Amino acid sequence: MKQSLSQKELLEKACANYQASVNLALPYLTGRGITAQVAQSARLGVVEHPEIGHEAYVGRLAIPYITKTGVVDIRFRALTPDQEPKYMGMPGVKTKLYNVLDIEKAKDWIAVCEGEIDALTLSRCVGIPCVGVAGATSWKPHYTRLLDDFERVYVYADGDSAGLSFAKDLIKEGLPVTIIQMPEGEDTNSMFVKNGAEYLRERAGLDNE
């Protein structure tokens, strides 16, 4: 009798499937400063041939959440303005912290930002260890415990009231936060595209670290 695949195995299978179609997203990704090499390293993909139950995600960017044990979740982002909603998650799956492997790589400090693309930008394109949350209101108490040991936590906040509120919420959590808010209407990725990696390092005073 054939044994059914575990949830972990199903996620790994889906990730590998979608990663094989990542080239379909390269026009979008390169427009946001994400190279093919970075996309491959983060195991980004496109839902071209959906796994069973993933039919609603066809044509979307697949963003895997990867831990030491492997793929633990996949979120799906619209690649065109007509795709609504912009982000979709799998039913019944609670949001998680993105790019948690950077927690072990980081030393005295780490960055936090909203969104997977922003976190990927800081981590892989700028060289700043970073974790990302699924949205400005998605912070959870156990995330705080994961970051408790850092001397500095740089919050790269979106350039809007929600972004500032998100950063202030992390201060209330007791983390040693330095707020780095982007200009109005901008986010971390858009400022990377416009001004490059050095701008984002300088904003945090990390240009010499």
Q: Where do the protein language model's features map onto the residues?
A:
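RNase H-like two-metal-ion nuclease catalytic core shared by retroviral integrases
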Residues: S165, G185-K194
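Short, acidic/turn-prone active-site loops that include or flank metal/cofactor-
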Residues: V133-W139, D158-S161, M182-G185
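Short, aromatic/basic amphipathic alpha-helical patches
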Residues: S165-G174
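Phosphate-handling DNA/RNA-contact segment within nucleic-acid enzymes
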Residues: Q7, E48-R152, F166-A167
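A residue-level signal for conserved active-site and pocket-lining positions in enzyme catalytic cores
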Residues: L29, T69, V155, T188
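TOPRIM metal-binding catalytic domain and adjacent DNA-binding surface shared by DnaG-type primases
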Residues: M1-A62, T67-K68, E104-K105, G205-E209
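Acidic beta-strand-to-loop metal/phosphate-binding motif
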Residues: V112, F150-A162, Q181
